[in-house]
């Protein structure tokens, strides 16, 4: 029994010494290689849907397009970002014109966010771009390139190159104090990019 205890003790000491040596080796830095310091560029030719992960900055930029109706945002630059993402993902661009002052804009946001099927369809087929229209910034230079807007929110469907395909007065998609799910979903489906 005493031999087994001594053997077990020696084994524990050997394991501890080996583990400490391994930690010391791991702590020594490896000299950096020139290749490790080279900047990594995201491959924008690959669609996000293919499983490629875009750079974190790309993700943040795309998320910001639909975050709010911000009078300080540049819709021309935002449209360029939306076009890159639309080409990358084989999507269309939905330009949502409105403002934080617009109650129907918030109703539309809530309607889409609370309906998992519509939200999922939107995310799979569209890059959603909010463009502010308010007293602070009417974005006239940008919006002058599109048909007249009759009410807010207003939706413009663009192809991935930014070409206008459709202008949608959202009043036609309303029902009572909200949006008609059947009409709204039919609108999204009608203007989604063709299946490949």
Question: How would you describe each model-predicted region?
Answer:
Residues 99-113:
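Conserved redox-active cysteine motifs that mediate thiol-disulfide chemistry
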Residues 73-76, 113, 118-138:
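Thiol-based oxidoreductase modules, predominantly thioredoxin-like and allied folds used
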Residues 51-53, 73-93:
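A short beta-strand-turn-helix
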Residues 20-24:
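Bacterial signal peptide processing site
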Residues 89-103:
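Short active-site neighborhood of thiol/selenol oxidoreductases, capturing the structured segment around
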Residues 27-73:
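N-proximal helix/coil linker or "cap" segments that precede and/or mark the start of modular domains
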């Amino acid at each position: 029994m005493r031999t087994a205890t001594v053997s077990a003790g020696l084994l524990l000491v050997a394991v501890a010494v080996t583990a400490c040596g391994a930690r010391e080796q791991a702590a020594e830095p490896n000299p950096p290689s020139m290749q490790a310091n080279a900047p990594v560029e995201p491959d924008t030719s690959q669609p996000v849907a293919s499983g490629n992960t875009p750079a974190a900055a790309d993700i943040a930029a795309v998320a910001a397009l639909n975050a709010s109706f911000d009078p300080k945002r540049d819709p021309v630059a935002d449209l360029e970002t939306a076009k890159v993402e639309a080409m990358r993902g084989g999507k269309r661009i939905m330009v949502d014109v409105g403002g934080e002052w617009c109650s129907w804009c918030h109703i539309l946001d809530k309607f889409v966010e609370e309906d998992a099927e519509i939200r999922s369809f939107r995310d799979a087929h569209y890059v959603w771009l909010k463009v502010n229209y308010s007293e602070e910034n009417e974005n006239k230079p940008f919006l002058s390139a599109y048909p007249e807007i009759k009410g807010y929110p207003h939706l413009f469907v663009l192809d991935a190159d930014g070409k206008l395909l459709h202008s949608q007065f959202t009043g036609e998609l309303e029902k009572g104090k909200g949006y008609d799910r059947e009409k709204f979903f039919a609108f999204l489906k009608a203007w989604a990019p063709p299946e490949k």
